[in-house]
Amino acid sequence: PLLVLDLIIQERGESFSHTVTAQHTSAKVEGLKAGTVYSVQVRARTVAGYGRYSNPVDFSTSLYVCPVSSSSTSMHLRRREELTTTTTGLKSREERFQKSDDPERSVQDLLPLIVGSASAGFVVILAMIVIAVVCLRRQRTGSELEYTEKLQQYVSPGVKVYIDPFTYEDPNEAVHEFAREIDISCVKIEEVIGAGEFGEVCRGRLKQAGRKETTVAIKTLKAGYTEHQRRDFLSEASIMGQFDHPNVIHLEGVLTRSCPVLIVTEFMENGALDSFLRLNDGRFTVTQLVGMLRGIAAGMKYLSDMNYVHRDLAARNVLVNSNLVCKVSDFGLSRFLDDNSSDPTYTSSLGGKIPIRWTAPEAIAFRKFTSASDVWSYGIVMWEVMSFGERPYWDMSNQDVMNAVEQDYRLPPPMDCPAVLHQLMLECWVKERNMRPRFGQIVSTLDKFLRNAASLKVLTSTHSGDLCRIGGTLPGHQRKSIGDAQDIKQQMSQTLPIRV
């Protein structure tokens, strides 16, 4: 949308120019000199900034003018630099000139009027410039600040960028900017359905004026919290509130003025993806599983395009609704885990806790988290989905997992896994992060698989003998990497991940 229209009007042969500013797609300039050639250029300003000035367009005013009080020479500018010059009272002046017996005498009679009109026009232009400057200065404290705030969220028109709430001097400012405050009377907690790092997770109802009552998930901040914990808890809402995508969990709002402090999100009927898959082991077709993976990849592409790095992408942090739509959730929580946290999923590394089995080697070694490290984690999520919630690397210790990955061992394909999917996993696990596919490429690849169902029918053929010939004596076992169920017990103690 147009915000400001700038015009530069310059008399031919003069270095001095006049600038006029308008808030609409048209502008009217009065008080121009009679019988003078002018050049005009136009540019528009939107939220994205100033555009370029148009090419100069010349026009000339009539030799005869009327008194400023009754009529004036005008110029109107409209879209695409349409220029229309109108002069009122010109016809009557011409008729009077024709009726005069002495043309030279008529010109002399009109000379004072011409000079007076030109002088008055110049005064009007100066007055308009002064008024425009004063108005612009007054608006800058308000409208210019608004433009600046909008532009902070755009690197180019239409491309929104994630803003880290911890860049705010007052974190509460970020919460109020990105999350909507909900009145306590609109929320009803029904039952506890789980526990999070900061408190309980409940199912409840949200009823707001003019909106249908809906089932929601409610995260609570446990009693006795510190101000630091409150800030970290609400930061997830500040992050979530910036996102709007069908494969990213939706924030309904927050309750910061109540006790306990609450975060309200949409409710996902089937809960976390890993436990949902374990409860439905073998019940979904490959096409359905690939559809789930496609949804997760689409959500991650959206987050990556916004320059957001998740850091903790795993099946446990993906939620599933009643239509099997998968949505990425749990934003930023991994960075806040304390070293005394009892969760074995996260291991201390360089002053913080990270999920070793899902984390790229450069992020483990140097805490270098990027969209490429999220792609590595996505490859592990693919393995979790295709194995129906199997634990990555089985019962290997985190240290053994790090050693295996460092020695270029990778997870073998789950049972009945299409070869193209395991190949995509291996591409996500390339050691050189710049060589891994981007989420946009992953979405396109999965779309291609879904369009060509035949490509998903070619399964990988993995045998225990092949794995043993790779070498090594790393501990661990597996349940689904080998198709022969009768040999599983023997192979659990001797099979290894694939080396690349």
UniProtKB/Swiss-Prot annotation:
Q: Which UniProt keywords apply?
A: ATP-binding, Cell membrane, Cell projection, Developmental protein, Kinase, Membrane, Neurogenesis, Nucleotide-binding, Phosphoprotein, Receptor, Transferase, Transmembrane, Transmembrane helix, Tyrosine-protein kinase
Q: Where is this chain's protein located in or outside the cell?
A: Cell membrane; Cell projection, Dendrite
Give residues where Phosphotyrosine occurs: Y168
Query: Which residue range or ranges hold the Protein kinase domain?
Result: 187-450
- One GO CC term on file: receptor complex
UniProt similarity note = Belongs to the protein kinase superfamily. Tyr protein kinase family. Ephrin receptor subfamily.
Which InterPro entries does the protein's record reference? Answer: Eph_TM, Ephrin_rcpt_TKs, FN3_dom, FN3_sf, Ig-like_fold, Kinase-like_dom_sf, Prot_kinase_dom, Protein_kinase_ATP_BS
**Name listed for the protein in its UniProt record:** Ephrin type-B receptor 3
Q: Which domain of life is it from?
A: Eukaryota
All residue ranges annotated as the SAM domain in the record: 421-500
Domain named Fibronectin type-III is located at 1-64
Q: Which residues cross the membrane?
A: 114-134
**GO MF annotation, one:** ATP binding
